[in-house]
Amino acid sequence: MTRRHAVAPAIAVLIAYSQVCAQSVRFDAVGDAIPRPLTSEPGDAARGRSIVVNRDAGACTLCHAVPGEKIYGNIAPALAGVGARLSPAQLRLRVADSTRVNAESPMPAYYRTEGLNQVAAAFRGKPLLSAQQVEDVVAWLATLKEPR
């Protein structure tokens, strides 16, 4: 076996392993927050807003009143002023897994994959949002300083 033939399978294994690791959803919560960002890249507030209002992504407007949106839900707290009430670390935990703060929360666990009920086979083991998407949403929520 030549060196070239030995390297190709090793590279394939590394690529597959990196893809599995990229889907890993570990985070360390401290109290009511996740102090460390989930990614090395900072969140992008514009992308975060897009995720929040997109019904195929975050779908936050189904339950929350969202500043600037005309159609929204009213069964969850309004998001106006949330950036003044909560730190980015607190926002991160609420987006990742709100049940860590309130066990009765109906909010989806956007970055949790275990302990969930009635998950379609195609979505098992996959978070609703990627780590970068969580950081993007947190970046946008942190900009919401005004109560209205």
Model feature map: region roles:
Residues 24-55, 148:
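Electrostatic cytochrome c docking/interface patches
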